[in-house]
From Swiss-Prot:
Keyword Signal: no
Gene Ontology molecular function, alphabetical: NADH dehydrogenase (ubiquinone) activity; quinone binding
Similarity section: Belongs to the complex I subunit 2 family.
Protein's organism: Synechococcus elongatus (strain ATCC 33912 / PCC 7942 / FACHB-805)
Record-level GO BP terms: ATP synthesis coupled electron transport; photosynthesis, light reaction
Name of this protein: NAD(P)H-quinone oxidoreductase subunit 2
Self-association state and partner proteins as the record states: NDH-1 can be composed of about 15 different subunits; different subcomplexes with different compositions have been identified which probably have different functions.
Source species taxonomy: Bacteria, Bacillati, Cyanobacteriota, Cyanophyceae, Synechococcales
Compartment(s): Cellular thylakoid membrane
Primary residence: membrane
Function: NDH-1 shuttles electrons from an unknown electron donor, via FMN and iron-sulfur (Fe-S) centers, to quinones in the respiratory and/or the photosynthetic chain. The immediate electron acceptor for the enzyme in this species is believed to be plastoquinone. Couples the redox reaction to proton translocation, and thus conserves the redox energy in a proton gradient. Cyanobacterial NDH-1 also plays a role in inorganic carbon-concentration.
EC number: 7.1.1.-
């Protein structure tokens, strides 16, 4: 094999965005080592520039015909491009939200950004991994970096406790997932690439394959915080640095769903009915427990933790539907969830920087002292609850419509009921912020310091908040382009083998389903 043939089979240009992130990571690390504390303003700019360049390259790779790299070990199709874009965007916004937070804590910003970029790199590779070894290495890169970020505030006992819990439970989850993958490898006769595994699995014993599926789903469910594999989520979210919680709730979760789609659809075609059943149970448990337990929370971060568990239940509806409309609505919801969830955490960060607390009761009367945070948090929470015309309403509408067309009537009705429950605890926070009587104002708000936007890191934090809030508001009204993007990413991914139950035609307001399926070709 000559060099040109090898280069053609490797097709390394597919992972050019990941290469840019690696170069950015090394540049940030070296800059921080050379300049030390003087690199405070330079390292975030370098990181965001590199992430922006990687996103630009991803857009140029859209609809390319040669999307397999490294002898089929990585798939750079349109679906992976969207998921990798979500990971990159969540990392970029997280950096904007982190600068002031990390600076005020007295820890190194350069090291923080380096670990965050490493986690992003793991999430990107996981979103396109098409081979078992690549999947596991990518998953561990993301996981280990997440453990380090969770315990990054070394002087905070809560951060140390959260990191230890996350590490212990995460290590057990990785071991379970690895055991399932090793069974899959053995049953496939030593094949590691997912398409080749699917071809060989017809000869496997059903019971052994089912055991493998159960272990693999357990590992994936941990990554997406699905009940009953959610125990780490509330404690880790409460004790971790708030910007890291924001990244874990969006970037890490998106990578987990990308893994779920690619691994389960490609490697377990014979057990589609079985894994749909398991995910239906996970979705029901996540919707009920996430929304019901959130009603009793007094900490804003714990409330958002249980909210993220419930949001995973909503996203699973699209996965269970298994149609083009289902996968498209799933991708669309993750796109808008990026902005509305990060926007909510940006408001929590701003409030905690000024008051040192995240207790919901301390938000009482906030609109009188900080209208920006009140407006931003209100819009993001209303969007998470699915109030029109915000982005979250259309995201849930598309998911429920796809689920209904796929015959998931009970699951969709349950999701509607739990969505109404979620509106209650979101509005409870908003009501707390807009109390009018001075005597109802909390002690933290009474002593609320005047905002000084000239402090280092405050302008990026405000920029991140404004971008997320505007995107949350506008993405609902202009939902067509985003949904078309999600639909194109799904229809262009051949491994899904879609036979849609109904074609979805979008308008600026609501999706319309054709009553008859498309004619067979």
């Amino acid at each position: 094999m000559d060099f040109l043939t090898l280069a053609g089979q490797l097709n390394a240009g597919v992972i050019l965005p990941e290469g840019i992130v690696i170069v950015t990571l090394l540049t940030v690390l070296v800059t921080d080592l050379i300049l030390g504390r003087q690199s405070l303003r330079l390292t975030p700019a370098l990181a965001i520039t590199g992430l922006s360049a990687a996103i630009a390259v991803l857009t140029l790779q859209w609809n390319t015909s040669q999307n397999l790299a490294f002898l089929g070990g990585f798939n750079g199709d349109n679906l992976s491009i969207v998921f990798r874009g979500i990971v990159l965007l969540s990392a970029a916004v997280t950096i904007l939200l982190s600068i002031r937070y990390v600076e005020q804590s007295g820890t190194s910003l350069g090291e923080f950004i380096t670990i965050l970029l490493t986690a992003s790199l793991g999430g990107m590779f996981l979103s396109g991994a098409n081979e078992l070894v690549t999947i596991f290495v990518s998953l561990e890169t993301l996981s280990i970096s997440s453990y380090l970020l969770t315990g990054y505030m070394k002087r905070d006992p809560r951060s140390n406790e959260a990191a230890l819990k996350y590490l212990l439970i995460g290590a057990a989850s990785s071991a379970i997932f690895l055991y399932g993958v090793s069974l899959l490898y053995g049953l496939a006769g030593g094949e590691t690439q997912l398409p080749a595994i699917a071809e060989k699995l017809g000869e496997a014993q059903p019971l052994a394959l089912l055991i493998s599926l159960i272990f693999v789903i357990a590992g994936i469910a941990f990554k997406i915080s699905a009940v009953p594999f959610h125990q780490w989520t509330p404690d880790v979210y409460e004790g971790s640095p708030t910007p890291i919680v924001a990244f874990l709730s969006v970037g890490s979760k998106a990578a987990g769903f990308a893994l779920a789609i690619r691994l389960l659809v490609t490697a377990y075609p014979a057990l589609t009915e079985q894994w749909h059943f398991v995910f239906t149970a996970l979705a029901i448990l996540s919707l009920v427990l996430g929304n019901v337990v959130a009603l009793a929370q007094t900490s804003m971060k714990r409330l958002l933790a249980y909210s993220s568990i419930a949001q995973a239940g909503f996203v699973m509806i699209g996965l269970i539907a298994g149609t083009e409309a289902g996968y498209s609505s799933m991708v669309y919801y993750l796109l808008i969830y990026l902005f509305m969830n990060l926007g909510g955490f940006a408001c929590v960060i701003l409030f905690s920087l000024r008051t040192g607390t995240d207790q919901i009761s301390e938000y009482a009367g906030l609109y009188q002292k900080d209208p920006l945070v009140t407006l931003g948090l209100s819009l993001c929470l209303l969007s998470l609850g699915g109030i029109p015309p915000l982005a979250g309403f259309f995201g849930k509408l598309y998911l429920f419509w796809a689920g209904w067309q796929a015959g998931l009537y009970g699951l969709v009705l349950l999701a509607l009921i739990t969505s109404v429950i979620s509106i209650y605890y979101y509005i409870r926070v908003i009501k707390m912020m807009v109390v009018k009587e001075p005597q109802e104002m909390s002690e933290s708000v009474r002593n609320y310091p005047e905002t000084n936007w000239n402090l280092p890191g405050m302008q990026p934090l405000r920029a991140g908040l404004v971008v997320c809030v505007i995107a949350t508001a506008v993405a609902g009204i202009l939902s067509n382009p985003l949904f078309n993007l999600a639909s194109a990413s799904v229809s262009g991914s051949s491994f899904l083998g879609l036979a849609p139950a109904a074609e979805v035609v979008t308008t600026t307001a609501t999706p319309v389903a054709l009553s008859e399926p498309p004619a067979a070709s």
